[in-house]
C-alpha cells in the first residue's frame, strides 16, 4: 500500500516537472505577479467583465487622451470608458515586458496611449475573451520579437483594440495625460513594421 502511494507521488511529481519544463505555467494568477491589486480589471477577470461591450468603438488615440478621467483610479468598472472595447490605429514606438504583461507605447498625431497585452499565465479561468487575448500575445511576440524588461524601439503600425482602463495620471512621455489605457488588448493587426 505504501509502495503504491509512493509511485503515485513520483508520477505526479514527474507530470508537474514535465509541465513546467514544457513552458506551461502551473501557478495561479495573482496580484503579486500579474499587475497589482487591479489585475482582475487588467485581465478582464473582474466581477463586472460581463458588462463590457466587446464590439469595439473606433476612435483615435487623441480622443481617448481627451476623455475626462475619474478623480481616483476606479477599482471596479463604473465608467463608460471601462465598459467598452475601443479600436485605434497607431505606431508602436516602444514596448517592454513588465509585471503582468507587455506594455506598448502607441503614438498618433501628437498623442500617446499605453496598451497592455497581459501575460497568458495571468489570464484566469474567469477571463472574458481569454482566447482572443492569448492570441494577441502569440501574434505580437511571434511577429515582432521576444520582449525583455528594457524598453525596445519598434516603429510598427498597428490596428489595435482593447478595453478601456483608468490608470494613474502620468506626465511622462508615452502615456495619456488622463491615465487612460487599453488594458487588456483584445485584438491586434500588424499593418507594417515587424
Over which residues does each language-model region extend?
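OB-fold and OB-like single-stranded nucleic-acid-recognition modules
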Residues: 24-194
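C-terminal region of N-terminal signal peptides and the immediate post-cleavage residues
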Residues: 15-27
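Bacterial N-terminal signal peptides
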Residues: 7-16
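Bacterial N-terminal signal peptides that target proteins for export
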Residues: 1-7
